[in-house]
Amino acid sequence: MVFLGKILPLALAALSVNGAEILSAPGAENIPNGYIVVMKEGTSTQDFDAHREWVASVHHERLARRGSTNVGGMRHTYNFNQGFMGYAGTFDEETIQEIANRDDVAYIERDQIMKASAIQTQRNVPSWGLARVSSRQPGGRDYSYDSTAGQGVTAYIIDTGIDIRHTDFGGRAVWGTNTVDRRNEDCNGHGTHVAGTTGGTSFGVAKRARLVAVKVLDCNGSGSNSAVIAGMQWAMQHASQNDPRRAVANMSLGGGYSQASNQAAAAIVRAGIFLAVAAGNDNRDARSFSPASEPTVCTAAASHVRDGKASFSNWGQLVDVYAPGQDIISARPGGGSRSLSGTSMASPHVCGLGAYLIGLGRGSGGGLCDTIKRMALPVISNPGSGTTNRLINNGVSQ
């Protein structure tokens, strides 16, 4: 947490107000009049309900005064039961200033666009990533694994959705929720590719895991940070209703540094769910991006077929492991496959490995990232300044 304290002044700019700070990530694509409001720790449910009623009344009073038909207002409510409570919506400057002046508000963050972390497509390339997970040397062509293969584990794919009818999922993929639009389908393809790497029968690391689509990004592969956090909350609550110790989640997406996003990610980990996150594709220090900069998640950088850092991959002390992320073949909506590159492709290898190890009884939750790091091979060349050189491995040596 000391390290995170050093990051914050570098990563966030704050508007000086008479009350809670209004934070904004430098270079972020902010959503006009969009805000995420986070309550102070210890706020009771009753006080939170009263606060939201007050916000609704203030907002509607402003609309009536202006004679406006632009509804806006509160859109998402967050209560992770793990030290993160708040809400998000669209408010005018006067309203957000009143909210900031409340004693029960910890901070306010400008809502921003979050994007999928895949960057390029190349057809007809060799599929090497899956084989690399079970090989001690590069160039392997086979993937060796225990037949449990993540059976009994649920993987939440927080992304663009999943083509749950794709034959590679064998009926193990189901729709969970949609916080971004009204199209309950993967109209982008990114999420289906990620799900295939996590748990596809042909392309996946954990071939018997159950896959749940949590759609937070639209057909263009983008969405608001507030919608992403709403999807994170849904996944945590759904897993907690079952057995969070047998749940993993993947977030192959990101944006500028967001204290709210990191706080939500940390709440998921505290709930006992293993969370794998893409480091990002800007060839920069991952500390400037979220949720990759949250220290308690398992942040994955991308490697290429020769066991080096992929040119686009983010790096830094907050990267936990490397995983295959360049020219990765996996499922595409409507059937068949395609190749994508990005830390988006690295993270689901880590998520799938987490599900695989839970199925073997090798751990769960946040501690699972430490297990994965211990099992990883110190083989990555030129990993980046201050960055681990460890590449994931499932322990089945070839």
UniProtKB/Swiss-Prot annotation:
Belongs to the peptidase S8 family. Its main location: secreted. It comes from Coccidioides posadasii (strain C735). GO terms for cellular component: extracellular region. Its EC number is 3.4.21.-. It is an enzyme of class 3 (hydrolase). PANTHER family: CEREVISIN-RELATED, PEPTIDASE S8. Glycans are attached at residues 220, 250. Disulfide bonds: none annotated. This is Subtilisin-like protease CPC735_050320. It comes from the Eukaryota. The active site is at 159 (charge relay system), 190 (charge relay system), 344 (charge relay system). Coiled coil: none annotated. Residues 35-115 form the Inhibitor I9 domain. One of its GO terms (biological process) is proteolysis. Secreted subtilisin-like serine protease with keratinolytic activity that contributes to pathogenicity. It is found in: Secreted. The keyword Iron-sulfur does not apply. InterPro entries: PCSK9_ProteinaseK-like, Peptidase_S8/S53_dom, Peptidase_S8/S53_dom_sf, Peptidase_S8_Asp-AS, Peptidase_S8_Ser-AS, Peptidase_S8_subtilisin-like, Peptidase_S8_subtilisin-rel, S8pro/Inhibitor_I9. PROSITE patterns: SUBTILASE (PS51892), SUBTILASE_ASP (PS00136), SUBTILASE_SER (PS00138). Residues 1-19 form the signal peptide. Keywords: Glycoprotein, Hydrolase, Protease, Secreted, Serine protease, Signal, Virulence, Zymogen. GO terms for molecular function: serine-type endopeptidase activity.
